[in-house]
């Protein structure tokens, strides 16, 4: 009895940690359940619904939101357990509309990029790693063709895939039935809006093709040209034409495109550069380096019979010249410049030591009425050799007495759809010959410049010239003015309509504003301005008003940054004046009158 009482009085020690853990594993406990119930928050379950409600309430304040949350929490106490859960079937219509709007914004951003297409956006499966991968595109010649900018060296995987696809579709065109009609109509509308804008992205490889393929042309301001005031010229300086990529040598030659806002420059750095002239940025469109060929003369040429046939002719002090084909067919199907070399004169090599001085003109066959281009080369011993602009074959030659110093081209309309091409050449003694190239170089007349000694330049103006060519046969006009420059700086100006019937015509004016050798003579397209310049000294350039023959007094000024002028060019519309100098810069001015 005593032993039993003693056993009952012995206290049982509480379970240690190991026993509690073992009992928990075997029998379980309510600790975890109680803790989870204490931490239970119904807001977590209804988080998506609350977010939708908050998105729909645009004008609610923070205090209002807090009151609504408390009200919702109070209502949850009276909700049955089976109503605390719901089947997610994609959300309500309002949230879907908002998501669709958000996706539309993203799609618009993606569509602004040239590398993203609708096919990539609607792809069934997209690998997110494609955007992280960087693919070098300068390793091989094949990948270099995928560049859209000269500044690119690496692109991500998405751009790489899209460019490979576009390159494939150039070879194997995409069938029309693949695209939806609505998509094709939208694309056509976008193309119509962009047509004529001529906005060039800096470094765009296809910029030249885009500009030449647009229908934008210079405005025809010559037909409605008003008379210039004789004393003051409204002129404003623009950004230098080659500010983005200046030349490494003097600008020896300038040429505006006959119909597009393009300017061609060339010099002894052996590089042709084409700039898109907008007066603000003047981006470089493309450039071409000719190894071992310093450039003395370069010019654009557009065929009268086929507007798509366009070339750039260039030459230096070498026994050959180059022709760069700019036809859209060649530029579209190949990223390599197509350049031909003219060097053979077929028995007349002794009369042509250098191809550096040349001009390009139009010649009409009197029998077939077909029109083709010709290249006129200033040779030695008084010769001028004439080549076919397409084949380079020697067609004819014209010879004068003495040493030829310069020549120019004039046109004479005969009847509707017919014209004559006249070659005017001068020697150092001021003796002038005029040849009819339609009659195999027949001499029309010969006359002498009054007081002409040491003649250096001759130029016609007021009609169709080599620097301002016509794009249609009906637009060809005979030139009214003829200017002759000399080593002493004198420039004699003749009116071809009145004073060219005698063998000793009298000039309408003798301009003596310059005192050094005349190196440039250029007329504005409408013949109201004569620009004369000398490269011997700085700032030796003057603009002469015609027909008053007075020099504009307000320009250039002592602060005009001309430098030593090496080349001058007017735009076909007459609204721009480009001046190249020995520093390799092309100054640009806008003539507000035009």
Swiss-Prot record:
Transmembrane segments annotated in the record for this chain: none
PROSITE patterns, per the entry: WD_REPEATS_2, WD_REPEATS_REGION
Subcellular location: Nucleus, Nucleolus
SMART domains per the UniProt record, alphabetical: WD40
InterPro entries: Utp18, WD40/YVTN_repeat-like_dom_sf, WD40_repeat_dom_sf, WD40_rpt
Sequence segments annotated as region (Interaction with UTP21): 101-190
Positions of post-translational Phosphoserine modification: 182, 184
Keyword NAD (UniProt): no
Function: Involved in nucleolar processing of pre-18S ribosomal RNA and ribosome assembly.
Record protein name field: U3 small nucleolar RNA-associated protein 18
Species name: Saccharomyces cerevisiae (strain ATCC 204508 / S288c) (Baker's yeast)
Name of the coding gene: UTP18
């Amino acid at each position: 009895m005593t032993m039993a009482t003693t056993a009952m009085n012995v206290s049982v020690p509480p379970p240690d940690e190991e026993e509690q853990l073992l009992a928990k594993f075997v029998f379980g406990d309510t600790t975890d359940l109680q803790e989870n119930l204490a931490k239970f928050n119904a807001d977590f379950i209804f988080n998506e619904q609350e977010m939708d409600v908050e998105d729909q309430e645009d004008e609610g304040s923070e205090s209002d939101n807090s009151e609504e949350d408390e009200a919702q929490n109070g209502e949850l106490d009276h909700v049955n357990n089976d109503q605390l859960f719901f089947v997610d079937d994609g959300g309500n219509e309002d949230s879907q509309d908002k998501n669709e709007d958000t996706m539309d914004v993203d799609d618009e951003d993606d569509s602004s990029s040239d590398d993203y297409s609708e096919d990539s956006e609607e792809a069934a499966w997209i690998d997110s790693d494609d955007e992280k991968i960087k693919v070098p595109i300068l390793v091989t010649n094949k990948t270099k063709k995928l560049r859209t900018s000269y500044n690119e060296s690496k692109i991500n995987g998405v751009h790489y895939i899209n460019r490979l696809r576009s390159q494939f579709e150039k070879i194997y065109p995409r069938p029309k039935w693949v695209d939806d009609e609505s998509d094709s109509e939208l694309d056509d509308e976008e193309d119509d809006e962009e047509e004529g804008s001529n906005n060039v992205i800096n470094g765009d490889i296809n910029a030249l093709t885009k500009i030449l393929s647009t229908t934008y042309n210079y405005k025809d301001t010559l037909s409605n040209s008003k008379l210039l005031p004789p004393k003051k010229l409204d002129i404003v300086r623009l950004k230098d034409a080659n500010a983005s990529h200046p030349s490494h040598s003097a600008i020896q030659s300038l040429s505006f495109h006959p119909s597009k806002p393009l300017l061609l420059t060339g010099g002894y750095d052996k590089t042709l550069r084409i700039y898109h002239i907008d007066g603000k940025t003047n981006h470089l469109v493309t450039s071409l380096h000719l190894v071992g060929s310093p450039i003395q003369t370069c010019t654009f040429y557009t065929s009268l019979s086929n507007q798509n046939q366009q070339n750039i002719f260039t030459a230096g002090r070498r026994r050959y010249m180059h022709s760069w084909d700019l036809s859209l067919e060649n530029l579209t199907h190949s990223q390599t410049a197509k350049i031909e070399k003219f060097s053979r004169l077929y028995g007349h090599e002794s009369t042509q030591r250098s191809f550096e001085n040349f001009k390009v003109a139009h010649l009409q066959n009197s029998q077939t009425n077909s029109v083709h281009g010709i290249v006129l080369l200033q040779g030695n011993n008084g010769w001028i050799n004439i080549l076919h602009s397409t084949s380079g074959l020697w067609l004819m030659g014209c010879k004068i007495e003495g040493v030829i110093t310069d020549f120019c081209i004039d046109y004479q309309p005969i009847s509707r759809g017919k014209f004559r091409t006249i070659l005017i050449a001068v020697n150092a003694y001021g003796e002038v010959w005029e040849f009819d190239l339609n009659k195999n170089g027949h001499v029309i007349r010969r006359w002498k410049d009054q007081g002409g000694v040491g003649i250096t330049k001759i130029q016609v103006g007021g009609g169709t010239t080599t620097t301002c060519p016509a794009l249609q046969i009906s637009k060809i006009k005979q030139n009214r003015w003829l200017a002759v420059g000399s080593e002493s700086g004198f420039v004699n100006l003749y009116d071809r309509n009145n004073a060219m019937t005698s063998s000793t015509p009298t000039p309408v004016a003798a301009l003596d504003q310059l005192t050094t050798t005349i190196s440039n003579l250029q007329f504005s397209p409408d013949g109201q301005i004569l620009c004369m310049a000398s490269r011997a000294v700085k700032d030796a350039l003057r603009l002469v008003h015609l027909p008053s023959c007075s020099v504009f007094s307000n320009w250039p000024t002592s602060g005009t940054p001309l430098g030593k002028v090496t080349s001058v060019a007017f735009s076909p519309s007459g609204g721009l004046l480009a001046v190249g100098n020995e520093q390799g810069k092309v100054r640009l001015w806008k003539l507000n009158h035009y």
